[in-house]
């Protein structure tokens, strides 16, 4: 990446990239927080969802994003959420109880089973969503207020990303079906 391209990426909170020399229609957008307020882009995608929203994020404390998922469920969209078990148990702002109250299917997961130090297993540290089998949101961005206003984070939005969305959907379903 040239210095000019890197400078442009740092100055503009949402950058759209299109594949060059390809018939592919996939559009990639990048958002950087805290200046980019990535939650606004996530909210837009949730609000436009028609059939399915699959969300796997380590930390979920953002009230607006949680409410948008509840509204999507009320519109008839299938919504499923996977969050990290330890984060949810140790953070009073985590939205696990909210999702249960809204009857949104929820899994509290740990990471893959492996011995790490003095504990078994790691973290469920994924940060992605698949929307209507054609949109993928992924990056370092946890769905928290801190991610929007304090932390240096990134979010990639892939639209019209059928094959990529299917890979992420498979990864989500593997998490969902893993024994607790």
Feature map (PLM): residue ranges:
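Short catalytic-loop micro-motif centered on adjacent basic/acidic residues
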Residues: 53-57, 81-83
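Secreted/periplasmic proteins that engage bacterial cell-wall peptidoglycan
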Residues: 58-61, 65-68
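Polar low-complexity intrinsically disordered regions
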Residues: 1, 16-22, 58
């Amino acid at each position: 990446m040239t210095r000019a391209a890197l400078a442009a990426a740092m100055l503009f909170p949402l950058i759209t990239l299109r594949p060059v020399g390809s018939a592919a229609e996939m559009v990639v957008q990048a958002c950087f927080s805290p200046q980019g307020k990535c939650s606004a882009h996530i909210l837009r995608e949730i609000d436009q969802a028609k059939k399915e929203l699959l969300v796997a994020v380590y930390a979920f404390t953002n009230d607006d994003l949680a409410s948008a998922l509840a509204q999507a469920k009320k519109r008839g969209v299938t919504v499923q959420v996977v969050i990290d078990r330890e984060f949810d148990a140790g953070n009073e702002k985590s939205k696990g109880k909210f999702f249960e109250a809204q009857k949104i299917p929820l899994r509290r997961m740990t990471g893959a089973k492996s011995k790490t130090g003095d504990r078994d297993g790691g973290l469920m540290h994924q940060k992605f969503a698949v929307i209507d089998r054609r949109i993928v949101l992924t990056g370092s961005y946890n769905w928290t207020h801190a991610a929007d206003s304090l932390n240096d984070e990134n979010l990639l939005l892939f639209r019209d990303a059928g094959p990529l969305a299917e890979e992420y959907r498979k990864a989500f379903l593997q998490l969902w079906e893993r024994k607790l």
